[in-house]
């Protein structure tokens, strides 16, 4: 065989591959396109990301080859959804829905913790909405709206209908509060990241972007828990400005931090309806771990900064009261 004088029969090739503990393709020196399930799923995911229409042909081929593979069916559905939206092609969107339905009973095969039954139903809701089947979309979003996760989608759909606009308000209000709280936490996370790495330029850019948003959140006519939160952010901004050689701007930020802290502690309120656009009479309240009072929150922030210059500036603000 090595000299090319003869070719063994197929059963013998199989036995030889088994004997040498290798695969037949390696034994034959033959490299096939990598069509294993995981590799195929990765190619479909890539086609989805780059919106490659040629991926649909590979998806259909893979679906014939692996009709009962969850990851193949799911990735094919996601590809059809992405391209259906991209091309405004309802036929592709309907195919995506069909594949998502097929994926549901195969979910037990899934090993990706980021994909769950809820993932499938929410994708179906999104596609239903894109197909203008709002009632089906609402039904699915409502069934899976754990902790208000999809209140924004529900509120948006309801608000399109003038007759149901008031029905949308509780959902929009809930979503507003959820996402504003998430934004505050995210900004605080980034701020800690930049401060710990002493990247004061990035910290300054972050606060310059975030503070106008945060200061616009509370209703101006009443005290809000956002005053307490913003007092801490303004104090951090003063710290960053000191570190970047801007003492006058730092003083202005420290003065605003002190003003907001005094304002909050004079009439503290954690009521959710102190936020602009929140539903009037919203009976939920907001919690934070900054400190019992705004004064305590700023002291905790100073401990975190551990910077004598910022502490001295803050003490000056307090003494001037």
What residues fall within each predicted segment?
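Recognition helix of helix-turn-helix/homeodomain-like DNA-binding domains
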Residues: 1-7, 29-30
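Hydrophobic micro-packing sites on short alpha-helices
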Residues: 8-28
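"A position-specific structural signal for the A-helix of alpha-solenoid helical repeats
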Residues: 42, 75, 79-82, 123, ...
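Flexible helix-coil transition and linker loops at the boundaries of alpha-helical arrays
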Residues: 60-71, 102-117, 137-142, 175-181, ...
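Structural signature of alpha-solenoid helical repeat junctions
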Residues: 68, 75, 92-95, 112-116, ...
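Short coil/turn linking the two alpha-helices of tandem helical-hairpin repeats
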Residues: 77, 82-88, 111, 132, ...
